[in-house]
């Protein structure tokens, strides 16, 4: 093998090795996703901007609210958010914990503890604690968006009546 030919093979091999996807940086993506989720919780907690709140879900997202029909797609989710914001005394906030990622870093899920408040029949605030599981996808634009969102009640403490 001539030196020129060997050099060409080395150059092609090095160039091909550099063409693969960038390695997945778990720590960096964890920070980005937790920050994005915290921003979403703050926007939702303000209870004012339906479009901004809905923007954190993907166009093909599905939400499964406790005791209610499944909500599919951005338009239906936007309507769900608008309806929630219209409930007297409505307020929601959550905090998610450490995400778990797919091996390629394109999907993740997180658990969360949430608190929702609504006005009771006499106007007194009712606090409704909950828990949630969200599934996130990193879209082509590099932004994390929620693709599945489900929440329910935590278990009742031992000895308490519901």
Can you describe what each PLM-predicted range is?
Residues 9-11, 48:
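Intrinsically disordered, low-complexity serine/threonine-rich segments
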Residues 1-9:
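Bacterial N-terminal signal peptides that target proteins for export
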Residues 19-55, 62-162:
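A beta-strand edge to alpha-helix "cap/lid" segment located at domain peripheries
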Residues 12-19:
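Hydrophobic h-region of N-terminal signal peptides that target proteins for export
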